[in-house]
């Protein structure tokens, strides 16, 4: 149930909020796509942990780059 809520929240963000922000993620795949993939692969708790860790790295002082879900 929590996994579904988290996934739908991310999809809402991707569809309605992200287009107005422009491309600002330093990583590929983007942080929202990474979060969806980690939730799908690892489930809610571990996927949320990976997502938060990734979002914490997404700032101007981190070089970014290719960082897939492992």
Curated annotation (Swiss-Prot):
Q: How does it sit in the membrane?
A: Peripheral membrane protein
Q: Which InterPro entries match?
A: Membr_insert_effic_factor_YidD (IPR002696)
Which UniProt keywords are given for this protein, alphabetically ordered? Cell inner membrane, Cell membrane, Membrane
Example GO CC term: the record gives: plasma membrane
Q: Where is the protein localized?
A: Cell inner membrane
The family database entries (SMART domains) matched by this protein are listed as: Haemolytic
Q: What is its main location?
A: membrane
Q: Offer one Pfam family short name for this entry.
A: YidD
- Parts forming coiled coils: none
Source domain of life: Bacteria
Q: What does this protein do?
A: Could be involved in insertion of integral membrane proteins into the membrane.
Q: What family is it from?
A: Belongs to the UPF0161 family.
Sorted alphabetically, which HAMAP family does this protein's record hold? Answer: UPF0161_YidD
Extract the NCBIfam families matched here: membrane protein insertion efficiency factor YidD (TIGR00278)
Q: What is this protein called?
A: Putative membrane protein insertion efficiency factor
Q: Which organism is it from?
A: Geotalea uraniireducens (strain Rf4)
């Amino acid at each position: 149930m929590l996994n579904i809520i988290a996934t739908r929240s991310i999809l809402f963000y991707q569809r309605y909020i992200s287009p107005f922000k422009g491309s600002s993620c330093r990583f590929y795949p983007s942080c929202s796509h990474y979060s969806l993939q980690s939730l799908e692969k690892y489930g809610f708790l571990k996927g949320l942990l990976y997502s938060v860790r990734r979002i914490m790295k997404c700032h101007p002082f981190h070089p970014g780059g290719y960082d897939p879900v492992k």
